[in-house]
Amino acid sequence: MKKTPLLNIALSRVIASLGHGDILMIVDAGMPVPAGVELIDLALTRGVPDFISVLDVVLSEMQVESHVLANEMAEVKPPALQVIESLNLEDQLGQQRWISHEDLKVLSRKAKAIIRTGECQPYSNVALVSGVVF
């Protein structure tokens, strides 16, 4: 059995397969997933699992070089934003970039995989760009 927090087989496989610059998205329950992009659907019910819990576990295994958020997130200020801001202060998410929600949907077409959570707070979505550990 693995010693690290992440137990989900599909998610563990995707993170292990990421190369430098690959995109992994963590999204709320309402974010559309483009055809052809792998979906890891963790959603069980509204709020389960929440965005913050999934982000925390993903970061335990993924080296992040940068991340992309929707401008609308800054306007709505879901709880996930405060956590992301704290992680930025700890330099766990690399450089931050803001784009429109519509542009984030376009960017999702380039994702290696999208992790769907049960989060129902609007605009609780992030595109994580994989870095390297060396």
Swiss-Prot record:
<dbReference type="GO" id="GO:0005829">
    <property type="term" value="C:cytosol"/>
</dbReference>
<feature type="active site" description="Proton donor">
    <location>
        <position position="20"/>
    </location>
</feature>
<keyword id="KW-0413">Isomerase</keyword>
<dbReference type="GO" id="GO:0048029">
    <property type="term" value="F:monosaccharide binding"/>
</dbReference>
<feature type="binding site">
    <location>
        <position position="101"/>
    </location>
    <ligand>
        <name>substrate</name>
    </ligand>
</feature>
<dbReference type="InterPro" id="IPR023750">
    <property type="entry name" value="RbsD-like_sf"/>
</dbReference>
<feature type="binding site">
    <location>
        <begin position="123"/>
        <end position="125"/>
    </location>
    <ligand>
        <name>substrate</name>
    </ligand>
</feature>
<feature type="binding site">
    <location>
        <position position="28"/>
    </location>
    <ligand>
        <name>substrate</name>
    </ligand>
</feature>
<dbReference type="GO" id="GO:0062193">
    <property type="term" value="F:D-ribose pyranase activity"/>
</dbReference>
<keyword id="KW-0119">Carbohydrate metabolism</keyword>
<keyword id="KW-0963">Cytoplasm</keyword>
<comment type="pathway">
    <text>Carbohydrate metabolism; D-ribose degradation; D-ribose 5-phosphate from beta-D-ribopyranose: step 1/2.</text>
</comment>
<dbReference type="InterPro" id="IPR023064">
    <property type="entry name" value="D-ribose_pyranase"/>
</dbReference>
<dbReference type="Pfam" id="PF05025">
    <property type="entry name" value="RbsD_FucU"/>
</dbReference>
<comment type="function">
    <text>Catalyzes the interconversion of beta-pyran and beta-furan forms of D-ribose.</text>
</comment>
<dbReference type="GO" id="GO:0016872">
    <property type="term" value="F:intramolecular lyase activity"/>
</dbReference>
<dbReference type="GO" id="GO:0019303">
    <property type="term" value="P:D-ribose catabolic process"/>
</dbReference>
<comment type="similarity">
    <text>Belongs to the RbsD / FucU family. RbsD subfamily.</text>
</comment>
<protein>
    <recommendedName>
        <fullName>D-ribose pyranase</fullName>
        <ecNumber>5.4.99.62</ecNumber>
    </recommendedName>
</protein>
<dbReference type="InterPro" id="IPR007721">
    <property type="entry name" value="RbsD_FucU"/>
</dbReference>
<comment type="subunit">
    <text>Homodecamer.</text>
</comment>
